[in-house]
A protein has these predicted regions:
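Negatively charged, low-complexity tracts enriched in Asp/Glu with abundant Ser/Thr
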Residues: 1-41, 107-138
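Intrinsically disordered, low-complexity regulatory segments enriched in Ser/Thr/Pro
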Residues: 41-98
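Sequence-pattern detector for short linear motifs
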Residues: 50, 64, 68, 103, ...
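Charged, low-complexity eukaryotic segments
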Residues: 79-124
């Protein structure tokens, strides 16, 4: 399965089950990787690829790999990371939605405040490269 196909399937699962989720994505120019931020990053981020990542300094909670068959989880750079193979896209979508709902329920208004803060940052001149190059999914 290609990374683009895996991305389309994942996005369809996420938007079908959670229509209000905000999705930004970026397809790398230098590799076959696609990067997604959910709710401006407030609901974490995903790297979809067919290869091990280079040490680019970015950290993604979720990773979807088209070249792997087994899932794993580990702590790396103080972040609990979870990798799913492309055969488990629906499980990944369910995990993301469950964790997003948990954050929203626990944080309440502060989750929305964080989302708005991140949106304002994205729109600012100080925003990082991802936000300058990414595309927001239109529904």
């Amino acid at each position: 399965m290609l990374t683009e196909e895996a991305t389309d399937i994942l996005i369809n699962h996420l938007t079908d089950k959670c229509p209000d989720i905000i999705i930004h994505y970026y397809h790398s120019y230098t590799s076959n990787s696609i990067y997604i931020k959910l709710d401006y990053g407030a609901a974490n981020s995903i790297r979809i690829s067919d290869h091990d990542k280079s040490d680019n300094g970015y950290n993604y909670k979720y990773e979807l790999r088209t070249d792997k068959t087994l899932s794993w989880h580990r702590f790396e750079n103080d972040i609990y990371k979870i990798m799913y193979p492309a055969t488990q896209i629906e499980q990944l979508a369910n995990k993301i939605i469950k964790e997003r709902e948990k954050k929203m329920n626990e944080k309440g208004q502060s989750y929305l405040n964080e989302l708005n803060k991140r949106k304002n940052y994205m729109d600012s001149e100080k925003s990082k490269k991802f936000y300058k190059l990414c595309t927001e999914l239109e529904r």
